[in-house]
Every structure is written in structure tokens, then in C-alpha cells.
Design a protein with these regions (language model features):
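Leucine-rich repeat
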Residues: 4-8, 28-32, 52-57, 82-86, ...
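Conserved hydrophobic position(s) of the canonical leucine-rich repeat
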Residues: 9, 19, 32-33, 43, ...
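Consensus "Asn ladder" position of solenoid repeat domains
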Residues: 14-17, 41, 66, 95, ...
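Leucine-rich solenoid repeat scaffolds
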Residues: 36, 61, 168-217
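Acidic/polar low-complexity surface segments
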Residues: 66-78, 131-135
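Conserved hydrophobic beta-strand positions in leucine-rich repeat
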Residues: 10-14, 34-38, 58-63, 88-92, ...
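Canonical leucine-rich repeat
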Residues: 1, 22, 46, 71-72, ...
């Protein structure tokens, strides 16, 4: 049963339970929230209990070790009804996400770090981080992206500096790239890019070419 949005919490830890769903009117949050924990549960969708338009931005929200994406979708409602997440760091690692959670960015979520390691993504197509024309409101805030331990074979042009001008750290290690994904390399703020251990389904090392001019990026 929900507390209701009249109840405003400063902290919430629901880790290590058997929770399958969190209703939209579960509760509200104060402007002093640092971190919220929903890890190690059975959530199939990203809960719609936040609001990206809030003037208050929480420190972090952790949805790791759930079943998000297992039904083929990341959210249970329509995009018109989804409100995003007003948090700087969003952790979605160890789920069953097959499609990049574009919903978070389309709603203007002010995310600076997104952790999507250990999921089931094979590609991140164009218009996952931006619409066909222009950019979403707050995608430029994204500085750190963790995509390790997926099954990615390519990145789209969404990962260029025109969409992510402040990207500083990105890790695509333990994926399936056979060619170097150069898109993030034109970010003037990029400090670290990890691409270790690229193998195919049989375990063969498949990344063999070093991109020309990478030392001058």
C-alpha cells in the first residue's frame, strides 16, 4: 500500500526484498534526498514515482539487480505519462534491459552518470539519446556512461559531442565490438574511454584495428 504523495521522505532503502511494483502515488520526496535504494528486488519496470521537472535533484537512485526490461519495455506506462527521474546518478546495472532507456532522457531527466552494465543490449540505435531534430533538454549534462558487460556491437552518432558535449568517462569493456566505436572520441572533455575484452559469442577476440590518430584526440 502506498504512503501517498503527502508523505515526503528524505531517505528510502527498499533493497533486498521481493518487490515487483511500486505504485505512482507511493510517496513524495523532500529536497534533502541524497540516495534511494531499490536494488535486489523483482521490479520489471522503472518506477514512475519521480519527476524530472522537479527543481530538486537527488544524488542517486539505484535500481540494480532487478528484472527491468524482462517484459521488453523499460517503463509500464506511455511516454506521455512517464515523468522521468530527477537524480544525478541512475544505476540500472544487472537487469534485463535490451533497449537503451531513452525514456529517461526524453523526459529531461538531469542525469550526469548512468550505469547500465550487465544488461542485454546489442545496439544503441540513432535517436536513443536525442530526437530526430535538436537535442533533449538535459542530455548535455551526461558526463559518465558505463555500458560494460552487454552485447553491444556498435554505437550510433548519438554519442558524438553534438549530443554529449561534456562526456568525460565512458566504458564499453566486455562487449562485442569488432571495430572501434569512434563516436565519443570527438568530445573535448573525454578523459577516459574503456574498451577492454571485446569477444564474439564463441569467445574469440574480435577487436583488431586501432583507430588512426587516436593519440591526437
Amino acid at each position: 500500500e502506498a504512503f501517498g504523495t503527502n508523505v515526503k521522505l528524505t531517505d528510502l532503502k527498499l533493497d533486498y526484498n521481493q518487490i515487483e511494483e511500486i505504485p505512482e502515488d507511493f510517496c513524495a520526496f523532500t529536497d534533502q534526498v541524497e540516495g534511494l535504494g531499490f536494488s535486489h528486488n523483482k521490479l520489471k519496470y522503472i518506477p514512475n514515482i519521480f519527476n524530472a521537472k522537479s527543481v530538486y535533484v537527488m544524488g542517486s537512485v539505484d535500481f540494480s539487480y532487478n528484472k527491468i526490461g524482462s517484459e521488453g519495455r523499460n517503463i509500464s506506462c506511455s511516454m506521455d505519462d512517464y515523468k522521468g527521474i530527477n537524480a544525478s546518478t541512475v544505476t540500472l546495472s544487472y537487469n534485463e534491459i535490451q533497449k537503451f532507456p531513452s525514456e529517461l532522457f526524453a523526459t529531461g531527466s538531469p542525469i550526469s552518470t548512468i550505469i547500465l552494465s550487465n544488461n542485454l543490449m546489442t545496439s544503441i540505435p540513432e535517436n536513443s539519446l536525442k530526437p530526430k531534430d535538436g537535442n533533449y533538454k538535459n542530455t548535455y549534462l551526461l558526463t559518465t556512461i558505463d555500458l560494460r558487460f552487454n552485447k553491444l556491437t556498435s554505437l550510433s552518432d548519438d554519442f558524438r559531442a553534438t549530443t554529449l558535449p561534456y562526456l568525460s568517462n565512458m566504458d564499453v569493456s566486455y562487449n562485442c565490438f569488432s571495430s572501434f566505436p569512434t563516436q565519443p572520441l570527438n568530445s573535448s572533455q573525454l578523459k577516459a574511454f574503456g574498451i577492454r575484452h571485446q569477444r564474439d559469442a564463441e569467445g574469440n577476440r574480435i577487436l583488431r584495428q586501432w583507430p588512426t590518430g587516436i593519440t591526437t584526440c
